[in-house]
Amino acid sequence: MKAEKLIFLKFGGSLITDKNQTETARIDVLQFLLSDLKQYMDENPQIRVLIGHGSGSFGHHAAAKYQTQLGVSSEEDWLGFQEVWTSARRLNSIFIEQATKARLPVMSFPPSASLISSGHKVKTWDIQPIQQTLEANLIPVVYGDVVFDEQIGGTIFSTEELFFHLAQFLHPSKILLAGLEEAVYQDFPDNQLPLRHISKDEATDSFIKPSQFQDVTGGMRSKVEQMQKLCRENPGTQIEIFSARKEGDLLQALNGQHSGTIIS
């Protein structure tokens, strides 16, 4: 597969769920996002898309309660691990159902079933089924999920971390991270000073403030730093963080009409 034909697209957890209400999906938002994607793919049949989505209010509450991200060892930890897995899977099932209704040929690839990490770094992950899904002109879907870890028992991998690993093998030309915020802001939460471009080599600690939402995988700063690292290791890949809260926003981004923050 040629890189120019592949886009990684993330639907942020804060976009597709109400992160202030436990396990509450925004079905109306999902529907117009998936409608935008369907229109784009119908108009651009040569393009391949890999989707990732966050867990939002489905995974982050349980993950924060048990601190699953930091490791799993006790019986209570493992019960928490399973609870996070259940919540993440529940949202993924909703996503797959809505995508199928939108006539998008999606297939889910839960990281917990195929990825083993060691010290929160990918040790093994058989991505051949994902590659073959793309070659068959189907749409693979990954999502933030628990994984077993050889050093710390278990942990959580965010969608951005999954994208980072997949990019080394699939080489997307573009990565779109759709969320609520219109850009990365240097004055959060006032949100008056958007950053239109962030260099892959630029330090983030001086201009990115903490997220307003509970996010066990690190929030905006972690997201930006992960994507900067991805850009450094995959020259030519362009990343955009943007808002898709309104119908048509995603379609514009897919068509290259930039409105958010570009990382390159």
Predicted segment positions?
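N-terminal glycine-/serine-/threonine-rich phosphate-binding loop
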Residues: 1-50
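Short beta-strand segments
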Residues: 8-12, 50-53, 109-110, 141-143, ...
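Glycine-rich beta-strand-to-loop/alpha-helix junction loops that act as flexible
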Residues: 11-14, 52-56, 242-245
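Charged helix-capping and loop-helix junction motifs
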Residues: 25-28, 123-128, 155-163, 221
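Ligand-binding beta-strand-loop-alpha-helix segment within the catalytic cores
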Residues: 65-146
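Polyanion-binding loop/helix "lid" in catalytic or ligand-binding cores
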Residues: 79, 83-96, 153, 161, ...
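Catalytic-site beta-strand/loop segments enriched in glycine and acidic/polar residues
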Residues: 129-161, 202-211
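Acidic, metal-binding active-site segment of PIN/NYN-like and related structure-specific nucleases
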Residues: 169-194, 241, 246-247
